[in-house]
Regions:
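RNA-contacting regions in translation and RNA-metabolism proteins
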Residues: 1-170
């Protein structure tokens, strides 16, 4: 089936194939970092399901790499992923003197590169959080230029138009 069984202390956890990063291969003895996605009880005992594709996983990786997140100076407000390809995280600083993007990137990219390496080369964009949904979406899609944005209140969605030549960077 392609699932991996991971020893976590005295118990075993399952990392399903669909929760692994695409094209990621694991071998016996590999050290694995993963997010505990679900813990449940079955007739055979307790089951622990791990994930390496969850947006929560990237949040936890940044907490490990960026002490300012763990200390509460910087907060990850949102995260979205296309596992193995790209991810975006939205960050906010609770201290005006601290640049949330620069802090998450680190000196010469050291912090973000450590997370990228753990995620098998997944490209990570870090954007500034904005409480205004329209402004947040415009910022999240940079460097693409947003031509128009329409908020659809009833479905809590937005229609965003960018030029076709900007589509790849959006």
């Amino acid at each position: 089936k392609g699932d991996a069984i991971v020893e976590v202390g005295r118990l075993e956890a399952r990392l399903p194939r669909n929760q692994m990063i695409p094209r990621e291969n694991m071998r016996t003895g590999d050290r694995v970092r993963a997010y505990v996605d679900h813990v449940g009880d079955t007739p055979k005992g307790r089951t622990v399901i791990l994930s390496r594709t969850s947006p929560e996983f990237i949040k936890k990786l940044f907490e490990l790499e960026v002490p300012e997140i763990e200390e509460g100076i910087i907060e990850i407000k949102a995260a979205a992923r296309d596992p193995g390809a790209r991810a975006k995280i939205a960050v906010a600083s609770h201290d005006q003197r601290v640049d949330p993007i620069g802090t998450c990137i680190g000196m010469r990219g050291s912090r973000v590169n450590a997370v990228t390496t753990e995620l098998s080369g997944e490209r990570i964009d870090i954007v500034v959080w904005n409480a205004d949904p329209a402004q947040f979406v415009v910022g999240a899609l940079e460097p693409a230029k947003v031509r128009s944005i329409v908020m659809l209140e009833d479905s809590h969605t937005m229609e965003v138009v960018v030029d076709e030549d900007n589509l790849a960077v959006a």
